Structures are given as structure tokens and as C-alpha cells.
Amino acid sequence: MKKKALRKDFYMEIRKSMGRFLSIFFIVAIGCAFFAGIRSSEPDMRYSGDAYFDRKNLMDLQVISTMGLTDEDVEAIEKLDGIEKAEAGYSVDALCTEGDNQIVMHVMSLLPSMNQVQVENGRLPEKSDECVVDADFLSKSTLKIGDRVTLSSGTDKPVTDSLKEDTFTIVGSVSSPCYIGFQRGSTTIGSGNISAFLCVPEESFCMEVYTEIYAQVKGAEKLTAFTDQYDQRIDSVMKEVEAIKEEREKARYDEIVTEASEKLADAEKAVSYTHLRAHETDSYL
């Protein structure tokens, strides 16, 4: 009897304040729908991002060395059990004038198959003095396809120590799987912040050694990026790479010392020969 009276009173209260009841009902319904949408969008975003990374053959690991990297380093990494494939590339940060501003661009070489860029407008570079530029940057910049950009090193060394040319023609705009956010990284030149990336053919660089090696991990493509399973797989292979770190560092150090010693020996021979010629000339006179 009490329950029946309570129920009757409950319905009467709703009828008396139907507007307030409906307001609360719809607020709760919208909140539940919004929460359900947020919960379902997170895995959808993961799967979409992972599918995009797989299509563009995005690397799983990046190896960088201050002493530079060689073909022997690439081979050593490819021989590891957990590595599917490795490719080496070049990169350098350079200053570029855009309107009245001087900005920093991250110049990198296009790889044979990994980290494939998506052409948004124009085409990919076909010559060593052609380039493609960050699409997000180009859409807001005074620069456009067909313009020529001149780069400088921002240091006391010329940019031509790294690049064969210092001026490039923009032939397209691209997006890269390496940059999925708005930030482009930091640098030691200019303002300290990189404004955009610029891609050129590998032959545009004149460096003797690579600046980085990109590697793909066996089995990683079947896993969803940014998940615990993916991170654990990458971490396990990272330990394999770190295990050969000292060996490869020593090999590279010895190579640098040997090259320097050979150059020193050649210079000493040249000096000795010059002294000998000078002595012979004095004797003749």
C-alpha cells in the first residue's frame, strides 16, 4: 500500500513539473550519448591511425648517432632477429627566409620505401634541386609551389657542407606520417623551433655518412600502434639494438681515427716532399 502511494506521488510530482523533468532527462541522455561517443572514438582513432601508418610504411625505430651512421650499421641492424627492414637517410636543420621572417626548416631525404609522404598538391621532386614542403606550413605561408627557397646553415659552416645545392624549387606540398601533430620539433639554430619540414631526393645531400637509420620491427605491423602490446614489442627489439650499440660505436670511432691518421700521414708526406724539394733547390742554387 505504501509503495503504491509512493508511486502515485512520484508520478504526480512529474506531472506537476513536466518541464523540469524533461530538462533533466535530456541533459542526462545527452551526457550519456556524449560519454558513449568519446569511449567509442578512442579505439576508432587508434585503428585509423594505425591503418594510415601501415599504408605509409612508417618506421618503428629511429637510430641516431653524433658520429654518423654507415652502411655497415644498417647491415648490423638488419641482422637482428627482431628487425624486419632498415633504411638509412639524411637530414639537416636549415634557415629559410619567408617574407620578413627567418624560419627553421628540417630538411630530410626521401627514403626508398619507408616513411612515405602523401602528396597533397603538385608532385614529388625528380631533380636534386627540387623539393616538397610541409602542406600545413605551405597553406599558411607566403611561399607557394613554383617558388625557389634558399637555405643557410645558421652556423659558421656553409649549408653546402650537407647539401649539394642551397636553393631548391618547390614542386609540391606533402604530409608525412612522421608528423601527426602541429609541432615540428626543436633545433639548435634560429629561434630554436622548427617551423616546417622539407623533403628532397637522397642525391641532394653530400654527406659522407647517414644521420639516421629507420627500422621496422617484425610483427609490429599486425599490432595496433600506441597500445601496450605494440610498446612491449618495440621495447623488446630496442634492447637488441642497444646490445650492439657499443660494438658499432667502437667500429665507427676506429673508422674515424683511421681516416684521420691516413690524412695526417698524407699531409706529413706532402710536407716532407716539399722540404726535400726546397732542400734540393737550395743545393742546386
Feature-to-residue mapping (PLM):
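N-terminal Sec/SRP start-transfer signal
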Residues: 1-36
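Basic-flanked hydrophobic alpha-helices used for secretion and membrane insertion
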Residues: 43-283
